[in-house]
Regions:
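Residue-level detector of secondary-structure boundary/capping sites
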Residues: 19-23, 45, 57, 89, ...
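Basic, low-complexity intrinsically disordered segments
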Residues: 20-21, 61, 241
Length: 343
């Protein structure tokens, strides 16, 4: 079973014509309704994350500043991250959505729970909002689960087009958390981080695994490299709990990346991950082409809901030839991580 954690209150994070605006979630929910799928899904309401929950990840200064900034009317926190008068409260609700999704998987008969929330979170560091993100929703949920349930090892897979620098920074020294991110080459896209060499530090070295993909990478390129990495990583790391950071901005129709994924990637990754982890919490991040996001989201939800694990049906037709550059990237990852994983 799969549950969606969603609230219309997320629309109160008013951002005007900013790319990260309320139409993102509206397009998803409207499409689910139009396709007759909404009534087939269990929709759960989130509750705001407590200050205690958030402060396991973020500094008091960060939380107080967000609150004060919003209450004073909001505006741009940096060159591209916007907050409105209600954004602080809605960001707490978004973090609470990720916690609620985690609770559903841990306490009820749900294999998958999907926090369909905004603002997104994976660029938010412990002390800074950035990249459209105010509070790191997934990190807050993970630390909640670690504290409440005593689970020790976690795996996070992030396929947003942009590297989740905030999530990576928060857990960079932690050997109990494996963060895997596949994203567009950081030479060519925000935030300019996420190179293979950024592999964790101290005891956490070897547990921050970046897969930087060149602009123009297609579904077949992603499938080639993920088939070589994910199964080994999930099998050898042996996590107690799994999170998935969901980003639709790698789609070929998305205006904020130069990747060329098609609709088939999203059901494919849903099929593939089901074979690697029996339960999983999904947390929405990016995606800025409303139509592509709505279509791809539904396809991914369907394979999770219906327990479809036949990946072959989603293999991109006529794209069997993988660029040599992709093979070189895998070889570099294989060599760099050889002390940690047997890719």
């Amino acid at each position: 079973m799969i549950s969606l954690v969603y609230s219309p209150e997320y629309a109160k994070h008013h951002t005007g014509t900013h790319p990260e605006n309320q139409r993102r979630l509206e397009s998803i929910m409207n499409y689910l309704q139009e396709e007759g799928e909404l009534e087939k899904l269990d929709i759960q309401e989130p509750v705001p994350a407590s200050s205690e929950d958030i402060l396991r990840v973020h500094t008091p200064h960060h939380l107080n500043y967000l609150k004060s900034f919003s209450e004073k009317g909001g505006g741009y926190l940096d060159f591209d991250t916007f907050a409105s008068p209600q954004s602080y409260e809605i960001a707490r609700l978004a973090a609470g959505g990720a916690i609620k999704a985690s609770e559903l998987v841990l306490n009820q008969d749900y294999d998958f729970a999907y926090s369909l929330a905004r603002p997104p979170g994976h660029h938010a560091t412990g002390n800074r909002a950035m990249g459209f993100c105010l509070i790191n929703n997934l990190a807050v949920a993970l630390e909640y689960v670690r504290k409440r349930y005593g689970l020790k090892k976690f795996i996070i897979f992030d396929f947003d087009a942009h590297y989740g620098n905030g999530t990576a920074e928060i857990f960079y020294h932690d050997p109990q958390i494996l963060y895997i991110s596949i994203h567009q080459d950081p030479h060519t896209i925000f935030p300019g981080e996420g190179f293979i060499e950024e592999m964790g530090s101290g005891e956490g070295k070897g547990f921050n695994l970046n897969i930087p993909m060149p602009p123009g990478s297609k579904t077949s390129d992603y499938i080639y490299i993920l088939e070589k990495i994910l199964e080994t990583a999930y099998t050898e790391f042996k996590a107690d709990f799994s999170f998935l950071d969901v980003g639709f901005d790698g789609h070929m129709e998305d205006p904020l990346s130069s990747l060329h994924l098609d609709d088939n990637f999203y059901p494919w990754i849903g099929c593939h991950l089901q074979k690697l982890t029996p339960k999983m919490v999904l947390v929405l991040e990016g995606g800025y082409c409303y139509d592509a996001m709505a279509r791809s989201n539904l396809k991914m939800i369907k394979v999770l809901r219906d327990k479809i694990t036949n990946e072959d049906r989603w293999q991109a037709q006529g794209e069997l030839k993988v660029k040599d550059e992709i093979k070189r990237i895998f070889k570099k990852i294989q060599d760099t991580f050889s002390p940690y994983f047997t890719f």
